[in-house]
A protein has these predicted regions:
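Rossmann-like adenosine-cofactor binding region
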Residues: 171-265
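Phosphate/diphosphate ligand-binding glycine-rich loop within oxidoreductases
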Residues: 43-118
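Rossmann-like dinucleotide-binding domain for NAD(H)/NADP(H)
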Residues: 222-224, 228-318
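N-terminal glycine-/charge-rich "phosphate-binding" loop or analogous flexible N-terminal tail
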Residues: 1-45
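Glycine-rich NAD(P)-binding loop of Rossmann-like domains
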Residues: 118-151
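Oxidoreductase and adenylate-handling cofactor-binding alpha/beta cores
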Residues: 100-116, 159, 293-301, 306
Length: 318
């Protein structure tokens, strides 16, 4: 009986599929490409390449799933991964370029007040110049210094901020890019020194409501929060009054509930840019190509009995 690789990635090009088929042939696998709209997903794959946890729910033969996403919250609680029957890997390292550019865009849109100018343009109203802020001379803190945080910090450095601070779990300073690194349990030390807070941390038990009412209050008046990590990292109920009062501003690509419900008060909140979780995805060709390349690299590793390069520890959350 042949071994099967199931691919559930709707955004692949014919060139991507050709590469996957060639790798499968080389390693003795047959390939089945499926669309996520199918009611009955294949349950006989030894390997699954997809960001959907649906494949793992009734897959007795599954031994490894490679997710196209960097975050893995959707796989928590699935027995096949929790009991060690199957390995799980992600596509961390593929999203740095696209999300870094997205974060720079979100940051500049808020500092340059493009939300207000765009709203005025929709009303056909010609606004007078508004007071703006700059990354130049600002103290910028990155909550998360992995691929996304690191790539963004490299770009932000070019704007000549007063300081670049990093917050991560282990206190490491990648390539000594940051002026100072804080561990997660030291975050309250850096928040009062932060003019712009850029969040790209994964969603874990440790980061749930990491920015609660107490910690939001530590940020200086006029600080900007930019979040592409996970929505629940910020306590939205605590953030709302800070935005409404005009003390803080925020640009959010992720939310505690997605899609954001129509009756959520954030929709009508001032000092806020709302984006519908579009920072990542596979919409940039470079991202898609890197995701496929990383999968093929680990596909060869798996077939040769070597460790996966991007294996996930579900208990840690990344």
């Amino acid at each position: 009986m042949s071994r099967k690789l199931v691919v559930g990635v709707p955004d692949l090009t014919e060139g991507d599929k050709k590469q996957i088929i060639e790798a499968a042939d080389r390693n003795g696998f047959e390939v089945e490409f499926c669309t996520m709209q199918e009611e009955a997903l294949p349950a006989d794959g030894e390997i699954v390449f997809s960001g959907s946890p649906a494949f793992a729910k009734n897959a007795e033969k599954l031994r490894w799933q490679c997710s196209v996403s960097a975050g893995v919250n959707q796989f928590k609680g699935l027995p096949v991964f929790e009991n060690g029957t199957a390995l799980l890997s992600n596509s961390s390292g593929a999203y740095g370029v696209t999300i870094a550019e997205h974060l720079v865009m979100m940051t500049l849109e808020m500092l340059r007040r493009q939300v207000e100018f765009a709203a005025a343009a929709a009303r056909k109203e010609w606004l007078k110049p508004l007071p703006v802020k700059s990354v130049y001379g600002s103290r910028v803190t990155f909550a998360g210094t992995g691929d996304i945080g690191f790539e963004t910090a490299k770009r932000i450095r070019a704007f000549e901020p007063a300081a670049l601070y990093g917050v991560n779990r282990k206190g490491r300073n990648p390539e000594n890019l940051f002026d100072r690194i804080y561990t997660q349990d030291q975050i309250e030390e850096v928040l009062p020194q932060t003019d712009i807070l850029i969040i790209s941390m994964p969603g874990t038990e440790e980061t749930f409501h990491m920015l609660d009412e107490k910690r939001l209050a530590l940020l200086p008046d006029g600080a900007l929060i930019v979040n592409v990590g996970r929505g629940f990292i910020i306590d939205e109920a605590a953030l709302l009054p800070e935005l409404t009062a005009g003390r803080l501003a925020a640009a959010l690509d992720v939310f505690e509930t997605e899609p954001l419900p129509a009756d959520n008060p954030l929709w009508d909140c001032p000092n806020l840019l709302i984006l519908p979780h579009v920072a990542g995805n596979m919409t940039l060709p470079h991202t898609r190509e890197k995701i496929v390349a990383q999968f093929l690299e680990d596909f060869d590793n798996y077939c040769a009995g070597r460790p996966l390069l991007r294996q996930v520890d579900l208990k840690a959350g990344y």
